[in-house]
Amino acid sequence: MILFPAIDLKNGQCVRLEQGDMARATVFNLDPAAQAKSFADQGFDYLHVVDLDGAFAGKPMNAQAVEAMLKVVKMPVQLGGGIRDLKTVEAWLNKGITRVIIGTAAVRDPELVKTAAKAFPGRVAVGLDARDGKVAVEGWAETSEVTALDIAKRFEDAGVAAIIFTDIARDGLLKGLNLDATIALGDAVSIPVIASGGLASIEDVKAMLTPRARKLEGAIAGRALYDGRLDPAEALALIRAARKAGA
């Protein structure tokens, strides 16, 4: 299991939203690069970054902040938000992003995902953000008529590296991961699935390490880390112990 610390970018700052609402943003760090370095120093080994402004604008809007982070950390970084065409995919990968996350375009333009995954094996993930079971797009401002499983099935044989599945109703509210829905998705497709939205405490990490969640690649932690509800040292020690034991 990988525990991904999250950095969400809005106006060049590190923020957390509640249920994806840009009007309910809390600024946690004015310097995203410093936050990234802090996560690296704490021992995390994969960073999750979202360009929130980009998700709404449909193009990268926080490139300067992302590039500053890439200069100060050596760990892999996955990035989502505003990645809607092959040119943007290629540009980010060339700048040092390990894996791009395609969200809205996965619903609107599935051929982009297939083309990108073929061109850049192992470096293209799909972000599926669900509200009441249906996938939301355009920075979660619109809800489509398709389910996360419908979308995931489209990419079953496309070479997609991972699916990041977010329960919008829980995101930023510290209500706990929606493991039942995430595991159901993970069991239904062969693509590795990452849980996102609501991780609240060490109990969520423990739940991720149980046999029923074994197929999941990992989970994303946001507000719980910023609020101090999740101790990075404790969480990472549990994960490393589980890895040694073969979990």
Curated annotation (Swiss-Prot):
Family annotation (Pfam families): His_biosynth
Pathway annotation: Amino-acid biosynthesis; L-histidine biosynthesis; L-histidine from 5-phospho-alpha-D-ribose 1-diphosphate: step 4/9
Gene designation per UniProt: hisA
Annotated localization: Cytoplasm
Active-site residues, Swiss-Prot/TrEMBL: D8 (proton acceptor), D129 (proton donor)
Single GO MF descriptor: 1-(5-phosphoribosyl)-5-[(5-phosphoribosylamino)methylideneamino]imidazole-4-carboxamide isomerase activity
Catalysed reaction equations from the record: 1-(5-phospho-beta-D-ribosyl)-5-[(5-phospho-beta-D-ribosylamino)methylideneamino]imidazole-4-carboxamide = 5-[(5-phospho-1-deoxy-D-ribulos-1-ylimino)methylamino]-1-(5-phospho-beta-D-ribosyl)imidazole-4-carboxamide
EC number(s) stated in the UniProt entry for this protein: 5.3.1.16
Alphabetical UniProt keywords: Amino-acid biosynthesis, Cytoplasm, Histidine biosynthesis, Isomerase
InterPro entries from the UniProt entry: Aldolase_TIM (IPR013785), His_biosynth (IPR006062), HisA_bact_arch (IPR006063), Isoase_HisA-like (IPR044524), Isoase_HisA-like_bact (IPR023016), RibuloseP-bd_barrel (IPR011060)
Protein name per its UniProtKB record: 1-(5-phosphoribosyl)-5-[(5-phosphoribosylamino)methylideneamino] imidazole-4-carboxamide isomerase
Amino-acid biosynthesis recorded as keyword: yes
Family: Belongs to the HisA/HisF family.
Source organism, top-level taxon: Bacteria
Gene Ontology cellular-component annotations: cytoplasm
Any single GO BP term: L-tryptophan biosynthetic process
